[in-house]
Structures are given as structure tokens and as C-alpha cells.
């Protein structure tokens, strides 16, 4: 949370849209600093979990949760001061369109923040897979046998069909953001050891989280 706050400097005011909010991690960060947050997701179970967590922490009155498809939002133009997304963009079927939607609904001078990673990097080739397996062996020795979605072959096969699965990012994001009209585009790679706990930092070492930050 502290690391994210460092990177959202200048974007932490006004009306915020959290796209693909999941359990509300990013929504809560903005709510805690006094922003009005609208959080959307297309998964009702995630929204319920996020609302429950927000209520327990006393911030439910600061966040409005909505069931919406990020690729066809019905918000009017120039509505939000900041649009933010964390670990959701790679799942979109039409990511270029999503950047266009974000640009449309942002106010002039508004901020766009996109936290993501090359989540399917281990499947890009044998060399990438080798490094990923090596890290997995280290984790197993340290923490014991574990399972996550990388062990779910059916899920991985579905993810491989997504348009961004084999696209090198954030280079792609930089190109599309420029074409969309965004200005002051910045790309940063986050310090994994500060962003994740020790287990996750090693698990995702081969696919570090990056931040795309830009203004309309």
C-alpha cells in the first residue's frame, strides 16, 4: 500500500474509477485518502467480497461498487479525475478499446494508472519456462508444496487465448497510449520485494509488475 501511494502522487484527489476492482485493494487506498471512488467489476462474487472488506474497515460509504463490463462502460465523457486498474487489464478481450474508453471518461488533465504484468511470461518459450520452474522449485523447498492458477491447465489454456497473453508489455501499452492521445506517459517497474510478500515476490520474479501512468 505504501509503495502504491508513492506512485499515485498527483492523482489522489477527486472522483476515482477503479476498473476490475477485485477485492477492492486499490479502491480502499483512494478511499482512505478522501477520494470518492466508484469500483467496477464483472464478477459479482468479487464485488460482494470487496464490499464486505470495505464495510469491515469502515469505508463502505466512500466506495460505490457496480457490476459493469469494463469494455463497454456507460459513464458520460469527462467524468473522472483518475482511472486506475490493478492486475485486470491483461484479461480484457479488447484492450485497445479499453484505453480509448478510459481516455473518453477522464476529465481534461485527469490521470490514468494501470498496474499490470506479463502474467503468461512463463509460457513464452522454454527459456522463460525454465526460470519460472527454477523459482517454483525454490519456493517448494522453502514453503512446501503449493498450488496456484499456474497449475490449472484448463484455466491457463483459456488465458492463452487472450489478446495480450503473448504481447510484450509495457512496450505495447506505451504505443497504444500515444495513439489514444494520452500525454506525459510514464512507465515504471515496481520494486517486487516492496510490492509483494516474500513468497509472491519470488513467484512473480520473472514477470515484474509495471505501472503505466499518463494524463489526458
Language model features with spans:
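Class I SAM-dependent methyltransferase SAM/SAH-binding core
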Residues: 17-19, 23-72
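A short acidic, Gly/Pro-enriched loop at the edge of an enzyme's catalytic core
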Residues: 71-82
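Core SAM-dependent methyltransferase catalytic element
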Residues: 180-183, 198-216
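Short alpha-helix
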Residues: 164-181
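Conserved class I S-adenosyl-L-methionine
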Residues: 111-148
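Conserved alpha-helix/loop element of class I SAM-dependent methyltransferases that forms part
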Residues: 1-13
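A short SAM/SAH-binding and catalytic strip from SAM-dependent methyltransferases
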Residues: 82-95
